[in-house]
């Protein structure tokens, strides 16, 4: 007998037929003699619909009340799935995030898990029940409901797998695994049999929507192997693990784009020690995540600094720079995107960057900023060119 954690996204439970499809997958796993914990997201576009409803009431809802509202989406999903499982003769019980033992910090709408009290889950498993848990949510020290942010259900599933020392953690999506690019946008993609935690973490943080990056961080920390599978097609998917069999195989594992990018530029910054700390320290205090940073060569005691952040954080970043750091010559560009290639094989092979740049040159795509690491190369380009860039780079590297 194995203990298996299965997570299903919103598209997998979006309507009655999909719910019963998921119920059959879970029931088959349980009937094979396994203990099963299921983590479920809100149905379809429920979260977006709830956000829209809040917008009908106020343009500035409190983060606490937003968490109270958004957590209701998962509660609908878990109840319906538990009903479907019981209808199939598979004893199941639904638990909210806090009933399942998720405790978080006080960062409403983007809370982090501080601990997981597994007694209730373990008790229900001992009664031979399938435990259906609401992902994305928990309870803080004030006994307030909190949510983990977009993709938080993946993180919930990995946390349960780590805490219970599960034999498997299966993440079911609407695609059949991890591909070298988004198969819905690029025609000649390849499905990966395996990918390392580090490679998957880079792809997830770059906008590949198969797995949430926080869930991959957690899986890497506790060495929880993940299986990415399709809820609609019962074929082998992709295993995410510490070391893969083909470490000396494919140089590049994926090409990804991220359109949630803004480029902020500060002109005429005093070229003196401590200025970078002043700027980015203030941004860090506001929890603004900065990605690529570019500083020009100083002239006449002045320099220019550009950096990227999420588009949704650009307005706050501008306000911090103007009001707290007292910079007046600040501009923002929200027409950008980031395209990246990821692969551990780049560490020991030359010429990969050249091919990436050649692909964009051949398609008249201008590169505005470049960032590199041991396993990643990223370029900031015009957002309108993002899909074309991904396709061209993929063709260059994988054909």
Language model feature labels by segment:
Residues 236-399:
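A conserved regulatory-domain signal marking ACT and ACT-like small-molecule sensing domains
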Residues 1-216, 308, 381-382:
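Nucleotide/pyrophosphate-binding catalytic subdomain
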Residues 55, 59, 90, 223-227, ...:
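Non-catalytic alpha-helical coupling and interface elements of nucleotide-dependent molecular machines
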Residues 34, 90, 224, 288, ...:
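Short phosphate-binding/catalytic loops that engage adenosine nucleotides
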Residues 219:
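Acidic-aromatic/histidine active-site loop/patch
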Residues 168-172, 226-228, 291:
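Short hydrophobic alpha-helical runs that function as membrane-insertion/retention elements
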Residues 43, 175-177, 222-226, 230-235, ...:
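Glycine-rich beta-alpha junction loops
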């Amino acid at each position: 007998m194995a203990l298996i954690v299965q997570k299903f996204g919103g598209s997998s439970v979006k309507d009655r037929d999909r719910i019963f499809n998921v119920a059959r997958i879970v029931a088959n796993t349980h009937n094979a003699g396994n203990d099963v914990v299921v983590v479920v997201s809100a149905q379809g576009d429920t979260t977006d619909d709830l956000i829209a409803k809040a917008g009908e009431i106020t343009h500035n809802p409190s983060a606490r009340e937003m968490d109270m509202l958004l957590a209701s989406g998962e509660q609908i999903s878990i109840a319906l799935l538990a009903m479907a499982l019981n209808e199939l003769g598979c004893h199941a019980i639904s638990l909210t995030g806090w009933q399942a033992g998720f405790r978080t910090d006080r960062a409403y709408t983007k809370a982090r898990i501080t601990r997981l009290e597994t007694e209730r889950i373990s008790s229900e498993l001992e009664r031979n029940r399938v435990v259906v848990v609401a992902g994305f949510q928990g309870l803080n020290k004030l006994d307030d409901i909190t949510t983990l942010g977009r993709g938080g259900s993946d993180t919930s599933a990995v946390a349960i797998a780590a805490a219970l020392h599960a034999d498997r953690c299966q993440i079911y999506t609407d695609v059949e695994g991890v591909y070298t690019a988004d198969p819905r946008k690029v025609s000649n993609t390849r499905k990966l049999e395996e990918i390392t935690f580090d490679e998957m973490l880079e792809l997830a943080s770059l906008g590949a929507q198969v797995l949430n990056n926080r869930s991959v961080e957690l899986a890497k920390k506790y060495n929880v192997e993940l299986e990415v599978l399709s809820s609609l097609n019962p074929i082998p998917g992709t295993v995410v693990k510490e070391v893969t069999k083909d470490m000396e195989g494919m140089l590049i594992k994926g090409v990804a784009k991220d359109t949630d990018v803004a480029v902020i530029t500060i002109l005429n910054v005093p070229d003196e020690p401590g200025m970078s700390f002043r700027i980015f320290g203030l941004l860090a205090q506001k929890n603004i995540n900065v990605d690529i940073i570019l500083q020009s060569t100083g002239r006449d005691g002045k320099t220019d600094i550009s950096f990227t952040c999420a588009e949704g954080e650009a307005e706050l970043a501008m306000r911090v720079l103007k009001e707290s750091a007292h910079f007046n010559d600040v501009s923002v560009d929200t027409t950008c995107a980031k395209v990246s290639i990821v692969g551990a094989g780049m560490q020991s092979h030359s010429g990969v960057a050249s091919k990436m740049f050649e692909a964009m040159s051949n398609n008249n795509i201008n590169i505005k900023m470049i960032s590199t690491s041991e396993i990643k190369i990223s370029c900031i380009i015009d957002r309108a060119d993002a899909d074309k860039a991904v396709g061209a780079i993929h063709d260059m590297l994988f054909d």
